[in-house]
UniProtKB/Swiss-Prot annotation:
Protein name (Swiss-Prot/TrEMBL): Large ribosomal subunit protein bL17
Family of this protein: Belongs to the bacterial ribosomal protein bL17 family.
GO molecular function, one term: structural constituent of ribosome
GO-annotated cellular components: cytosolic large ribosomal subunit
Domain of life: Bacteria
Organism, as annotated: Prochlorococcus marinus (strain NATL2A)
The keyword Transmembrane helix is assigned to this record: no
Gene coding for it: rplQ
């Protein structure tokens, strides 16, 4: 049973789901905003906030965990340099999900995820 599981399955096998979320997290940290489906946006929010929390901690162990998750090593170093000054006074809620118009092909709910 899947009681109290944090990440939705997104109709993908575990390895594909993890790769998708890693890619979306990397893209969100790099660009600052990503357009995706609403279900993926909600799953992405958890992973991105976890990476920013690691960056706020700033320890070597946190840096290594973030490097193991995010695809771009230089992006992790830049995140760790800027996270404390950008999110130092904020206790979570680093991302914002804004719903947009449904996708034209299959009418699925779309959303924009952006860093606050």
């Amino acid at each position: 049973m899947r009681h109290q599981r944090r990440i939705p399955q997104l109709s993908l096998p575990a390895d594909q789901r993890k790769a998708l979320l890693r890619g979306l997290t990397t893209q969100l940290i790099r660009e600052g905003r990503v357009t995706t489906t609403k279900a993926r946006a909600k799953a992405l929010r958890n992973e991105t906030e976890r990476m920013i929390t690691l960056a706020k901690d700033g320890s070597l162990a946190s840096r290594r965990r973030a490097i193991g998750y995010v695809y771009d090593k230089q992006l992790v170093h830049a995140l760790f340099e800027k996270a404390q000054e950008r999110y130092g006074d904020r206790e979570g809620g680093y991302t914002r999900i804004v719903r947009t118009t449904p996708r034209r092909g299959d009418n699925s709910e779309m959303a924009i995820v952006e860093l606050v």
